[in-house]
Amino acid sequence: MKLLILIFLTNFIYAQSSKESVITVYKDGTALVKQQIVWNTVSKGESTLDYDDIPKSIHKDTPFISIENAQVLSQKFVEKVFSSDEYFLSKKGTPITVKLKNEKAVSGSLLEISSKRITIQSKYSVRSFNRDNIEYIETKDNLSNPNFSPYLSWEVKNNRAGKLKANLVYKLSNISWDAIYRLTTNGQTKGELVVEAVISNNSNKDYLDARINLVEGEINNIKTEQMNNYSKLSMSRSVAPQSASTELGDYHIYSAGGVKNFTSKENITVGIYGPLNVNYEKIYVFENFERQQKDEPLKVEYTLSNTEKDGLGIVLPAGKVDIYTSSNKGGFEFIGSDKMGQIPKGESSKIQAGYAFDIIGKRKVLNYDRQRKSEEAVIEIVISNTKSEPSPIKIVEHINGDWVIKEQSHDYIKEDASTIHFIIDVEPGKKEYITYTYRKEWK
């Protein structure tokens, strides 16, 4: 079905060009854009300036502008765009022409229009038509300057005729970034770490000749409605030089210096740090709760310490860690991934790679005695190491309430009011037995 409307355009002063932009990207899916724009020919005195090269996901309450040699009198954000449905709804009671498929056109006064039917009153009758059978609807109106996309408009007063340069600032959704770590392990203590940033432009706008900054840290935002959902993005990788973090008040900021063009539906990967030779602690963890009985492989856990002596001592953003291990053939294989929070200098983070095939933990409750005001349990834990090398083991036990430990076979460390752990080494091809009794009392 065609919609025939006669449209005449009059002159408005639209921006002739958009220059360099600076984009600050946050991890909550928003970004701040600082855009240079130019109007080449503007008359002296009061003028109306329009700019329509804006993304659909712009936060409409955020734009503000500064213009050289001009005073901004007012600003408006125009969202209304031409819609044939809205247009014809506004034409109820006025003459229209409906052309049916394989039939002559019918003219009359529009009574009703919906997604399924159109009803008109002709000279002698009222007729209702199925929209699927209509070839086109026609009105003889002349539309002056219909809007096809949202735009910003300013009333300005400038001191002289000629070119006007401006700096426009606004926020938008659907642009985000995240950190990706690639840790390649080589044995129990040493490996290589690469830190990259993946920047996603999920908006509908291309940013050309752009400088991109990445902010690490959680900012407070009033949630706004996401205006669009988009399909899968394309991927590209930049070989940009490494970027050091600088402070931005209470946050940290990284420069994605290798990015120039940031086009819609695109992911760009840029380097932040690395490759770095790092030290880590690898340990196998067996974690349990009170009367729980288990027989399962142990969790493989790596601890990264953000210190200079361990090859770091830098600001590490939160992100995903992909873990690889060196193979006997000189390559490497993927062995797991985990999420990691921000690691300030001097702090550490634990990363889980998966579960070990050759190290098994078995936990039994050998005896349990509950009285009216107390309970007591005897616990046995067996760790079997079928690997060809010694393995460090951490056994974590969670016990709630008012408890004491007695008759333990190994020394333990109390972590907090409900957690203890044992640290042991199990020789290759051996088993290690750990036993203890916990007693709880209450009034």
What are these regions (language model features)?
Residues 3, 14-443:
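Long, intrinsically disordered, low-complexity accessory segments associated with secretion
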Residues 10-12:
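N-terminal signal peptide c-region/cleavage motif recognized by signal peptidases
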Residues 1-7:
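Sec-dependent signal peptide recognition
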